[in-house]
Amino acid sequence: MNNSIFKNPSVKPFAFKFGLVKRVIVGGPYVAKPDDYFGIKMAIEIDRPCDVDIPTKDFSVPKYEDLDNGVRASLIPIAKNKPVFVGCFGGLGRTGLLMGALAKALNIPEPVLYVRANFKSHAIETDQQVKFIGNYTPSLKTKLMVSVAKAVALAY
């Protein structure tokens, strides 16, 4: 992982257990994403290339299917320990929302509290976003991909 990315104070790492291994992804304003990172863009208002686009208005939540597809699409790059960047305009609300959904898919207890303790204390900014994570249940496809990705992670 390119540590020069952390010269921007709005960009922070987010570490978590991924099966038997530890993984770190990066979050912040999407405009700070380095070109060589796998990009998950949560901001409908930002027009930059990305690998996964989850179009979401500021202070809002995405469509369930879009978020679930985004979580699923992020799993193999994370498993392969590729540099992954999650971002929105400010790098807090929608960015934290994706991280919370990922944590929930990985069965991390209290995903909102986990994101706030391990990424940014103000991440997941609105009550609507908190409730969305509370109500998010990964689809069967996503649950199966979590199992596959955990096995893949052991090889990397």
Located regions from the model:
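Conserved G/P- and acidic residue-centered "switch" motifs that form tight phosphate/ATP-binding loops
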Residues: 91
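Ser/Thr-glycine-rich phosphate-binding loops at phosphate-binding pockets of nucleotides
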Residues: 95
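Cys-dependent protein tyrosine phosphatase-like superfamily
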Residues: 1-85, 98-156
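Short cysteine clusters
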Residues: 88
